[in-house]
């Protein structure tokens, strides 16, 4: 996966690879949910309880500069947020659950495209994800470089960073060059705003 990254909502080959893997583990697989989303289900025992385990699998539009055997083969596209790792971990967990079958109920492996552009989850949900594949809870995770091997962090509520888009509109006011005090200079206001906002984190 790391060698063959695909951008958000372009993950056709990655989705095929994932579907083939979970089919080989014995899961019932549904593809094309919200375009490239995948749900793989496995029922064991007689319980009506079900859980979802979720991972994302899109890459970023960034050039990888590492010189490693598994370096991205695509110019300007790379798995630099670790979504290949997330999917690999979920595939490994899915394989383990299928081999051991040490649970009672249904496990659903949810593979989400387009996390980086915030398109994948809404697309899957709008396509009936939870109506077609009801679950009592969904568990997800994100890699965190710097943790020791085998460590996990848990918390209630939000954790790690998120991306939101918002806009600020600055409205200037023109004036005569001899009377600048009667105007509002949007360039000065915008420059001050950029510096003030950046000072929040630096």
Q: Which ranges hold each PLM region?
A:
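Acidic/His- and Gly-rich active-site-bordering loop/insert found
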Residues: 2-79, 88-103
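Histidine/acidic-residue-rich, glycine-tolerant segments that coordinate divalent metal ions
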Residues: 68-78, 85, 103-202
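Short, glycine/acidic-enriched loop or turn micro-motifs at the edges of active sites
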Residues: 59-61, 83, 145
């Amino acid at each position: 996966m790391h060698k063959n990254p695909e951008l958000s909502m372009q993950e056709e080959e990655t989705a095929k690879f994932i579907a083939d893997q979970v089919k080989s583990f014995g899961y019932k697989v549904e593809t094309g949910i919200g375009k490239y989303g995948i749900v793989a289900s496995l029922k064991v025992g007689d319980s009506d309880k079900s859980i979802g385990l979720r991972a994302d699998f899109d890459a970023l539009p960034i050039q990888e500069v590492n010189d490693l055997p598994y370096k991205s083969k695509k110019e300007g596209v790379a798995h630099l947020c670790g979504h290949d790792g997330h999917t690999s971990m979920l595939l490994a967990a899915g394989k383990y659950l299928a081999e051991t079958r040490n649970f009672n109920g249904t496990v659903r492996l949810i593979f989400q495209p387009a996390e980086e552009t915030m398109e994948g989850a809404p697309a899957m949900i709008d396509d009936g994800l939870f109506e077609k594949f009801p679950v009592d809870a969904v568990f997800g995770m994100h890699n965190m470089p710097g943790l020791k091997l085998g460590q996990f962090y848990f918390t209630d509520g939000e954790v790690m960073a998120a991306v939101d888009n918002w806009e600020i509109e600055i409205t200037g006011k023109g004036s005569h060059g001899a009377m600048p005090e009667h105007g509002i200079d949007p360039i000065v206001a915008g420059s001050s705003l950029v510096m003030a906002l950046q000072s929040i984190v630096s």
